[in-house]
């Protein structure tokens, strides 16, 4: 009598073990994976092609359903751009806090304390609190071939006017170089390459023509 009971007990344990293994595998297959580490407290995870941000100290997810976000090593500002439901916002890379909720149709990285964002097809600049510093007065150029980053360097940023011409503005939103070029690239070693529609030239760090458009 004892032997059949022993066999039944072994079979029961085997069944439980199999069920636990199946459950573990199903959980593992559907579980999220670590995507990136932004700081000791803030990490991103991916599951079903969607990202989430989590504060590792509290264990709480601060943002979920993210479509894409900047990599941790893409730049070093405290706020990171993310996209959710076709809108852009910013989270704090150190805490994971959703500082500026997703509300803009386009957004660039923060540089020198400001970031370009787009609302109603107009470009403006905000600070780290989401406050508008430069009004939404510039038309958004949809020509992706130009690949011009609307990012401040040394107090200046490339910008387009209503005619589609590119110039340079300062942090007050004032034109310091009138828009007359097809595009002006972000500076490399203080020099900016410009294109006038036919030839390329170079501006120096004072925005004077260093090399005329002859190349």
Annotate each PLM feature.
Residues 21-215:
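Residue-level detector of conserved, function-critical positions
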Residues 1-11:
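N-terminal Sec-pathway targeting helices
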């Amino acid at each position: 009598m004892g032997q059949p009971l022993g066999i039944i007990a072994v079979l029961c344990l085997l069944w439980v073990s199999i069920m636990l293994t199946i459950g573990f595998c199903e959980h593992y297959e559907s579980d999220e994976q670590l995507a990136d580490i932004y700081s000791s407290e803030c990490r991103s995870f991916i599951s079903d092609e969607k990202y989430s941000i989590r504060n590792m100290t509290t264990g709480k997810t601060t943002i979920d359903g993210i479509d894409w976000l900047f990599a941790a090593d893409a730049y070093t500002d405290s706020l990171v751009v993310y996209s959710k439901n076709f809108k852009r916002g910013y989270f704090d890379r150190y805490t994971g806090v959703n500082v500026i909720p997703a509300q803009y149709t386009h957004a660039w990285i923060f540089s020198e304390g400001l970031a370009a964002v787009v609302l109603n097809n107009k470009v403006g600049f905000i600070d780290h609190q989401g406050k508008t510093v430069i009004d939404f007065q510039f038309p958004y150029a949809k020509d992706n071939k130009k690949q011009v980053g609307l990012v401040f360097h040394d107090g200046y940023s490339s910008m387009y006017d209503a005619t589609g011409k590119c110039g340079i503005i300062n942090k007050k939103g004032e034109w310091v170089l009138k828009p007359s070029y097809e595009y002006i690239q972000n500076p490399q070693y203080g020099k900016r390459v410009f294109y006038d529609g036919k030839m390329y030239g170079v501006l120096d760090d004072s925005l004077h023509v260093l090399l005329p458009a002859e190349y």
